[in-house]
């Protein structure tokens, strides 16, 4: 007997007013029927709601900040350990890759993989880049900016991921 398992009512949004996005970065969290047919979910079941509020840590969305002194990337990688992550800089791009093999979780077995690529500003000092992973799974990539008259090096190199013992609070805009 096939039984459809519905997502809990408190995790549903207001249909077309706040539609879900199929390509949101939920690493292996699974798809629901409203992800595939968002326009039908509110017409088939008017009481069917998706969550209105998703925090940065729950959504896996990255945040990029670039101010006068530094360039910072925050990325939620809570399902990955530092050994599962590879961060490298090549030319004007930073590439963050995460992959872990199949492992057991509460619902069965799962494997995850992602690849993100960000363009670095031309005035970031690539020789002083750092990357750390907090206890709550927030990856922080940081690079100081140099004065505009100096030239930055653009050779490919790997950036080691260090582990922090304290959790990182969600980045605020």
Swiss-Prot record:
Zn(2+) 1 binds at residues 100, 102. The modification N-acetylmethionine is found at residue 1. The modification Deamidated asparagine is found at residues 101, 123. Zn(2+) 2 binds at residue 107. Changing residue 105 to H: In a breast cancer sample; somatic mutation. Expressed in the eye lens (at protein level). Changing residue 139 to P: In CTRCT9; results in protein aggregation in the cytoplasm. Residues 52-164 form the sHSP domain. Gene3D superfamilies: 2.60.40.790. The modification N6-acetyllysine is found at residues 70, 99. GO terms for molecular function: identical protein binding; metal ion binding; structural constituent of eye lens; structural molecule activity; unfolded protein binding. Glycans are attached at residue 162. It is found in: Cytoplasm; Nucleus. Contributes to the transparency and refractive index of the lens. In its oxidized form (absence of intramolecular disulfide bond), acts as a chaperone, preventing aggregation of various proteins under a wide range of stress conditions. Required for the correct formation of lens intermediate filaments as part of a complex composed of BFSP1, BFSP2 and CRYAA. This is Alpha-crystallin A chain. It comes from Homo sapiens (Human). The gene is CRYAA.
């Amino acid at each position: 007997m096939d039984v459809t398992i519905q997502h809990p009512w408190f995790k549903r949004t207001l249909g077309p007013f706040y539609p879900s996005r199929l390509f949101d970065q939920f690493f292996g969290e699974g798809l629901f029927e409203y992800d595939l047919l968002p326009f039908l979910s509110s017409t088939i079941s008017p009481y069917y709601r998706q969550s209105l509020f998703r925090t940065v840590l729950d959504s896996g969305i990255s945040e990029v900040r670039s101010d006068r002194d530094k360039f910072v990337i925050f990325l939620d990688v809570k399902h990955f350990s530092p050994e599962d992550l590879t961060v490298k800089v090549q030319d004007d791009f930073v590439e963050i890759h995460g992959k872990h093999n199949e492992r057991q979780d509460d619902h069965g077995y799962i494997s995850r993989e992602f690849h993100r690529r960000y363009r670095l500003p031309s005035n970031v000092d690539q020789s002083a880049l750092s990357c750390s992973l907090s206890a709550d799974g927030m990856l922080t990539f940081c690079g100081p900016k140099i004065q505009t008259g100096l030239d930055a090096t653009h050779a490919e190199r790997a950036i080691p991921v260090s582990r922090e013992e304290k959790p990182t609070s969600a980045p605020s805009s």
